[in-house]
């Protein structure tokens, strides 16, 4: 249904337009996107004729500073915090509204010699400032346009236009597919662009290494930062893992209540201890401790989910009632850490098939799933049964 990111990049490099869709739980819309560097009056005319939306120009913060583009409003109350600046026209234009003059304004924005005084305000081009980090920080069309431009090796600026149906309603995926077919345009998703960047870019940095004696044995501890957020992760390494042989690995998501306080609501603490003990017995392995509290929703939201469970909701229903997916974890950062450690073939300590799929999506091969089942307790029987019934965990209860 959708095209590969590589196909879209090739078309963009040729000055063509692509369609980019965002998540159905976000705006659930599609935009025409082109590279600002290659913009022509013909492309602008195509967008306004067949897209019918507002023509905007996503740019980096650097462009906005050079052109002295102030925010459109002092207090942005837009639900998605779209970073509009004041609208502009180049001083050489007349009304600024024609396709030719809009293309002129866009091209002059990219002119290194241009400065703020070269543009009238307000105007008919609407710059948008993309978040640093692109779609990995904000999954919007603004960031997608700048990311695509950078991936093409072009100036980090795009031209976007929302696609509206002839009856005035927003075009959704079925409409967008028809549009893409009609005009022979590549169609991609922001979700796929995020996955592409996670797969092709190095997002983790090895910060510090120490020797860590524990009750289970002595491990080589390696601390990692990442460029997506402020979360810091740690890998506990045992023995020589550089032989190329499959390595026993446990990817453990942080659980303060279970790991530290010994909560009986879950089996996280016992799993952590059992994994460390098993790696120690084998004399070789890795425990990767990921700061993904509460399956990615954070500590306070996990406690809120616990409160809902006390009211009769199960662990999945509680997450969804709070507005989160059942499992918000992403294994891209963890996969990059494992690859930084030189691992390729894993014997994965897990009961979760989704974790296997999540890691294998990043060119890691799970040779064997090693079960890690803990005895159920009265307090967590329902929780564990829900993980089996709704999350597909492989447990014998």
UniProtKB/Swiss-Prot annotation:
Sites where the protein binds Zn(2+): 255, 266, 268
Cysteines joined through disulfide linkages: none
Biological processes per GO annotation: riboflavin biosynthetic process
Keyword rRNA-binding among UniProt keywords: no
Annotated site, Essential for DHBP synthase activity, chain positions: 124, 162
Protein's pathway: Cofactor biosynthesis; riboflavin biosynthesis; 2-hydroxy-3-oxobutyl phosphate from D-ribulose 5-phosphate: step 1/1; Cofactor biosynthesis; riboflavin biosynthesis; 5-amino-6-(D-ribitylamino)uracil from GTP: step 1/4
Annotated stretches, region: GTP cyclohydrolase II: 200-397
Record: residues binding Mg(2+) 1: 27
UniProt binding sites for Mg(2+) 2: 27, 141
Reaction catalysis annotation: D-ribulose 5-phosphate = (2S)-2-hydroxy-3-oxobutyl phosphate + formate + H(+); GTP + 4 H2O = 2,5-diamino-6-hydroxy-4-(5-phosphoribosylamino)-pyrimidine + formate + 2 phosphate + 3 H(+)
InterPro entries xrefs: DHBP_synth_RibB-like_a/b_dom, DHBP_synthase_RibB, GTP_cyclohydro_II, RibA, RibA-like_sf, Riboflavin_synth_RibBA
Active-site residues per Swiss-Prot or TrEMBL entry: 327 (proton acceptor), 329 (nucleophile)
Start and end residues of each stretch annotated as DHBP synthase: 1-199
Function comment: Catalyzes the conversion of D-ribulose 5-phosphate to formate and 3,4-dihydroxy-2-butanone 4-phosphate. Catalyzes the conversion of GTP to 2,5-diamino-6-ribosylamino-4(3H)-pyrimidinone 5'-phosphate (DARP), formate and pyrophosphate.
Record family assignment: In the N-terminal section; belongs to the DHBP synthase family.
Name this polypeptide is given: Riboflavin biosynthesis protein RibBA
Gene: ribBA
């Amino acid at each position: 249904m959708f095209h590969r990111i590589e196909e879209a990049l090739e078309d963009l490099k040729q000055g063509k337009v692509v369609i980019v869709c965002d998540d159905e739980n976000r705006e659930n819309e599609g935009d025409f996107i082109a590279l600002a560097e290659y913009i022509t009056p013909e492309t602008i005319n195509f967008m306004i004729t067949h897209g019918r939306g507002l023509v905007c120009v996503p740019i980096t913060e650097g462009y906005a500073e050079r052109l002295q583009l102030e925010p459109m409003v002092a207090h942005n109350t837009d639900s998605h915090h779209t970073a509009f600046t004041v609208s502009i026209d180049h001083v050489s234009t007349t009304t600024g509204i024609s396709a030719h003059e809009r293309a002129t304004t866009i091209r002059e924005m990219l002119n290194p010699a241009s400065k703020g005084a070269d543009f009238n305000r307000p105007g008919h081009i609407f710059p948008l400032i993309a978040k640093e980090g692109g779609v990995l920080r904000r999954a919007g069309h603004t960031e997608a346009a700048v990311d695509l431009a950078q991936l093409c090796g072009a100036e980090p600026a795009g031209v976007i236009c929302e696609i509206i149906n002839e009856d005035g309603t927003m075009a959704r995926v079925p409409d967008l597919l028809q549009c893409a077919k009609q005009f022979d345009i590549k169609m991609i998703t922001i979700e796929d662009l995020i996955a592409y960047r996670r797969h092709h870019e190095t997002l983790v940095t090895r910060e510090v290494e120490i020797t860590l004696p524990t009750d289970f044995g002595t491990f080589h501890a390696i601390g990692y930062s990442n460029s997506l957020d402020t979360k810091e992760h740690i890998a506990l390494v045992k023995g020589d893992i550089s032989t190329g042989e499959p390595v026993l690995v446990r990817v453990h998501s942080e659980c303060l209540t279970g790991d530290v306080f010994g909560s009986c609501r879950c089996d996280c603490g016992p799993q952590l201890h059992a994994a460390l003990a098993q790696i120690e017995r084998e004399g070789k392995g890795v425990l990767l401790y990921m700061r993904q509290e509460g399956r990615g929703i954070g500590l306070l939201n996990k406690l809120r989910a616990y409160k809902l469970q006390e009211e009769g909701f199960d662990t999945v229903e509680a997450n969804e009632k709070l507005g989160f997916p059942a499992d918000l974890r992403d294994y891209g950062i963890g996969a990059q850490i494992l690859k930084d450690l030189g691992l390729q073939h894993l014997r994965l300590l897990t009961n979760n098939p989704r974790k296997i799929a999540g890691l294998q999506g990043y060119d890691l091969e799970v040779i064997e799933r090693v079960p890690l089942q803990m005895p159920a307790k009265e307090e967590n029987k329902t929780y564990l049964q829900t993980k089996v019934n709704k999350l597909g965990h492989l447990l014998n209860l």
